[in-house]
Swiss-Prot record:
Function field: Peptidyl-tRNA hydrolase that cleaves nascent chains-tRNAs that are not stably fixed in the P-site of 60S ribosome-nascent chain complexes. Acts downstream of the ribosome-associated quality control (RQC) pathway to release non-ubiquitinated nascent chains from 60S and 80S ribosome-nascent chain complexes. Does not act on ubiquitinated nascent chains, which are cleaved by ANKZF1 for degradation.
Catalytic activity: an N-acyl-L-alpha-aminoacyl-tRNA + H2O = an N-acyl-L-amino acid + a tRNA + H(+)
Gene3D superfamilies membership: Peptidyl-tRNA hydrolase
Disulphide bonds in the chain: none
Stated name of the protein: Probable peptidyl-tRNA hydrolase
Gene: Ptrh1
C-alpha cells in the first residue's frame, strides 16, 4: 500500500470537469475476508475492473484508503475506511467534505443479513435497517439519501449466532459463490452509476 500525502492532497483539491461519485465499501479495517467486510471486497473488485488496483493510497485526513478511477466521463472516488464498522461514517463524511460531494453522490456497499448469499439489491436511501456501518454514515452525513448496494450474506438460524456469523469468514462452499458475486455486484453498481452520470442527479 502506497502512502502519499502529496498525491492525496493534490487529487482531493483538484476540480473534476465531469461527474464525480464516492463509492464506500463498509467493513472492519483489519478484518478482510469476513462476511461483515464483504463491501470492502466488492471495492477491491471494482478497483481491479477499472484498472486501479495498484493505486490505493492511504489518506490520513479521512482515515481511509482511497483510489480514483475513471468511468467514462465520470470519476469514482473509491474508499475503504481504516476504522471499525460502527464508525465508518466518519471516514465517509470526511471524504465527502474533501471532494465536495453530497449524500446523493455517495454509494455505500455493505453486507445484508436479510438476503441469502448470492443475492444483491440496490436500495435508494432509507433507514439503516439495523446495520451499524450504515447508521454511522447516516449520522455523520446527517442524511439517509445515499444509494446502497446490499450484498447478501444470509442470516443464521439462531439470533445469538449473528455476531459470530458476521465476524466470521466465508466457508469454502460460500467462497465458490463469491467470485461470480463480486462480478455481479460490480456490474450492477457501475451500470447504475453510468446511467446516473448521463442524466440529472435526481434520476435515482
Amino acid at each position: 500500500m502506497r502512502r502519499s500525502w502529496a498525491l492525496s492532497r493534490q487529487v482531493s483539491e483538484a476540480r473534476f470537469p465531469g461527474k464525480r461519485w464516492l463509492v464506500a465499501g463498509l467493513g472492519n479495517h483489519g478484518m478482510p475476508g469476513t462476511r461483515h467486510s464483504v463491501g470492502m471486497a466488492v471495492l477491491g473488485q471494482i478497483a481491479r475492473r477499472l484498472g486501479v488496483a495498484e493505486n490505493w493510497t492511504r489518506d490520513s485526513r479521512c482515515a481511509a484508503d482511497l483510489a480514483l478511477a475513471p468511468l467514462g466521463d465520470a470519476q469514482l472516488v473509491l474508499l475503504r475506511p481504516r476504522r471499525l464498522m460502527n464508525v465508518n461514517g466518519r471516514s465517509v463524511a470526511r471524504a465527502a467534505e474533501l471532494f465536495g460531494l453530497t449524500a446523493e453522490e455517495i454509494y455505500l456497499v455493505h453486507d445484508e443479513l436479510d438476503k441469502p448469499l448470492g443475492k444483491l439489491a440496490l436500495k435508494l436511501g432509507g433507514s439503516a435497517r439495523g446495520h451499524n456501518g450504515v447508521r454511522s454514515c447516516i449520522s455523520c452525513l446527517n442524511s439517509n439519501a445515499m444509494p446502497r448496494l446490499l450484498v447478501g450474506i444470509g442470516r443464521p438460524t439462531h439470533p445469538n449466532m449473528v455476531e459470530n456469523h458476521v465476524l466470521g469468514c466465508f466457508s469454502p462452499e460460500e467462497q465458490e459463490l463469491l467470485s461470480p458475486l463480486m462480478d455481479q455486484a460490480t456490474d450492477l453498481l457501475l451500470d447504475h452509476i453510468r446511467a446516473r452520470s448521463q442524466g440529472p442527479l435526481s434520476g435515482l
